[in-house]
Amino acid sequence: MNIIKTEIEGVLIIEPRLFRDARGYFFESFSEREFDEKVAPILGHSVHFCQDNESMSSYGVMRGLHFQRPPYTQSKLVRCVKGRVLDVAVDIRKGSPTYGKHVAVELTEDNHVQFFIPKGFAHGFAVLSETAVFQYKCDNFYHPEADGGISILDDTLGIDWKIPTDHANLSEKDTKHAMLKDFDSPFDINIDLYK
């Protein structure tokens, strides 16, 4: 497992170690022990995942930008097991020097890359292939009453989603999220969300 730090502290790209031969390939998609050994020293704390989710979406589907409000905040470890997606984490912690900034990474069935999104970030993705199967691990259970989001179509975020706007396919809920300028974040850089 190779851990790549990004330009925003705590947001990580994870490359698994692949074993290939004439039959195909094998890799450990997740090892709690190795994740804790390699990621906890970077983050300054451990992360314990408790729920796995999977979605299937067609080209142009955009999901996000989602988060859960305190006290039900979530970290996520995501990957694309079929197809291709552009995955994005946006810093929405008040007082953060990178507030409103984002990290984008292409996750594909071929690169096997995983993306770690810490608490205090909004998360979303756009499907770039005909279909995509997307999996994610969460360190807190889903609480619908704590659902939150910011607009995935907010131009001020400067995200190039790599799909034409007229091909974007959003849920009704995701069309109603506030733009960043109108958003009152429930997160603060000075509050440790992992305590």
What is each model feature region?
Residues 107-131:
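Conserved metal-binding segment of the jelly-roll/cupin
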Residues 1-110, 131, 138-195:
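Non-catalytic, conserved peripheral segments adjacent to functional cores
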